[in-house]
């Protein structure tokens, strides 16, 4: 009993992650202070809910003996994942019914068509006008779109981010929100941040909560500032881990920015470096209420589970009356979160591009542009390990495993430390694969102080070991790695692209907050979209975005690593704690 009670404290992965942030977390290192939280209720931390990925109320999928993800390839990190619906066990009745449209394909390409049905078995599908989709390239353009979105909004502004910075650009963004509230009496604002990161005090004695405090005080009836608190930080851990270190247990990591019916989805936070010289990815989906409403609902549900900023004491978080405390009622909190969020995962639900409601249709053939040969679909995915919601992990695993041999596959990951599942799927695949990650100089921790200064070298060792495994598995001619290197810039872009045979440009991209690592899978709240299209203009935009990221890169090979000197201490840290990075 004693060993079990002490296990969370001495768990080496948590200990190392905590030590890593002592002394700085990269270019935006700050000082810390303890956050005061008012909470009510009693309870204790329990194991996560063992319910399957989708609730019993969701439509079920006919079981096939052969899974699209071979059990020899798919690493199951938790027993509960065994209860999740395996991709490949979908019912083809949706594509082989007796209706007049049943013999038609969604996409002309066989792989795209099969992938469509696989993904629709795991959650809703949204038809989108491809002319309404654009990819942003520069951080400054990301910031300008945020400012412009705030200025244009008439009914809602919904933002989810890890945190809001405290520099001039962030203050200007909040100022524009105040002006927008003055101009539009019907406008409502909801901002969801991580409660631990959002109340951390910086060198300027400010935090996300204090920067937003005046906006909340002026318009408390129309402004909501939600602060998510992970239920995994409880008990002794809650008492002994100081601010900054406690963030390693789990955070709200979704990055979505909604302005009326426009959605800007990214991996970028609301911070100066993400507005200036930290390269990320950003997709803008305009005038598409169905997709915007879906992501707005994600934020609303998480917000309903979160603590809230006290307008009278801006760095203090309050628990709403009747709410479940994530700290003292951890198990109840997880069960409630699962129940609420799993309602989003409605399989075989199709939303037409011209729909002004949240109503879906029964068949994708009832949508508008299904017969023009250039249809475009978006599949949102969420990953919330603390609540046992693993939709993104399941579909990403399937994509890694199912990419056709004659396709071109591209992955970007700034912190390249794939889960063992993803790594095995990549190494046993056959398509040509190009990977881009950050060089040590482009790592966000480069130049920081304390143990965190070792982070770039830790990732360099992991990258070298990956290259060695590529060689050892005879994948040297198939898999290549590039490193992003740009003077005074850091790299934070995440996602992938797939270019199928007989296509000149990518037809598929994944973009959002997940990073393909164990932290994204197990600890944080994540969301992204899978975009599939045969529209030539949109494919060209996807190609341009991909090529832009590859512009400032250098080839990474084993010879390069022979020139990099890594201390024995760093090697020891990776040897002991590498699976957690």
From Swiss-Prot:
Presence of the UniProt keyword Transferase in the record: yes
Gene Ontology terms: cellular component: mitochondrion
GO BP terms, alphabetized: cardiolipin biosynthetic process; phospholipid biosynthetic process
Disulfide pairings: none
Catalytic activity: a CDP-1,2-diacyl-sn-glycerol + sn-glycerol 3-phosphate = a 1,2-diacyl-sn-glycero-3-phospho-(1'-sn-glycero-3'-phosphate) + CMP + H(+)
Gene Ontology molecular function: ATP binding; CDP-diacylglycerol-glycerol-3-phosphate 3-phosphatidyltransferase activity
Cited InterPro entries: PGS1, PLipase_D/transphosphatidylase
Top-level class of the enzyme under EC nomenclature: transferase
Involved pathway(s): Phospholipid metabolism; phosphatidylglycerol biosynthesis; phosphatidylglycerol from CDP-diacylglycerol: step 1/2
Keywords assigned by UniProt, alphabetized: ATP-binding, Lipid biosynthesis, Lipid metabolism, Nucleotide-binding, Phospholipid biosynthesis, Phospholipid metabolism, Repeat, Transferase
Domain of life according to the entry: Eukaryota
Residues at the catalytic site: 253, 255, 260
Sites where the protein binds ATP: 160-167
Every PLD phosphodiesterase domain range: 248-274, 487-520
Region Disordered: start-end pairs: 27-65
Enzyme Commission (EC) number: 2.7.8.5
Compositionally biased tracts (Low complexity): 44-65
Reported function: Functions in the biosynthesis of the anionic phospholipids phosphatidylglycerol and cardiolipin.
Family note: Belongs to the CDP-alcohol phosphatidyltransferase class-II family.
Protein name (Swiss-Prot/TrEMBL): Probable CDP-diacylglycerol--glycerol-3-phosphate 3-phosphatidyltransferase
Organism of derivation: Dictyostelium discoideum (Social amoeba)
Gene from which this protein is expressed: pgs1
